[in-house]
Amino acid sequence: MTKDSIKFVDTYHKKFFVADYDYFYDKFDVRVSFDCVEKIITNAFFDFQDCAGLGKEKKYKLDKTELGYELSTVEERAISRKIKKFYKKKRKNKDFMLVLQRILIDPEYFRPVKVSVEDLDEDMSVSVNYGAFKQFSEKNFPEKIVFQLAVGNNKTSLELKFLKIDFDVPLEPNFKISPKFKRIE
């Protein structure tokens, strides 16, 4: 991951992915930036609407649960032309969608342990789950991050496991992609 692109190689399945951040807008109508992805991966507090560049000030409802503190907000969001085409295929005519965002905060570390966004009218959601916190370079960090995307009965997940993490180290990506690998679209 660099400031201008995301690259990863799945050596087990012999696949690779390379794209700039506009890929997510072009494909899913979601604006994502390097700063947003960095916050998600480093387990910092983030808000999907801020990541999308909307930057609206919002009010959160706070609840104390047995798992921690839950912040939630519901807002009406205008639908772009791309998403309107999706709804028209489903024979629905919508101009707005209701979006519910929930953030579960761990009471011990005061860090997110789960962040989810749901379209309340449709069966669509995305979530990020952080688990197995442990010490890396004297910093508490999740050993595992699970991303889940659900659209109806189609569910996709990606699990990241961290074995070693070094902080504040200059880094330069230096991997090569074999010509035998298939590109993930």
Regions found by a protein language model. Give the residues of each.
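Gly/Pro-enriched, hydrophobic low-complexity segments
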Residues: 61-179
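Hydrophobic, well-structured mid-protein blocks that either form specific transmembrane helices
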Residues: 39-77
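Compositionally biased, low-complexity linear motifs
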Residues: 20-24, 49-51, 58, 152-161
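Short, cationic low-complexity segments
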Residues: 180-185
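Solvent-exposed coil/turn segments that connect beta secondary-structure elements
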Residues: 4-5, 11, 42, 76, ...
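Structural signature for solvent-exposed beta-strand/loop edge elements and short helix-capping sites
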Residues: 23, 28, 36-47, 59, ...
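An acidic-aromatic
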Residues: 1-39
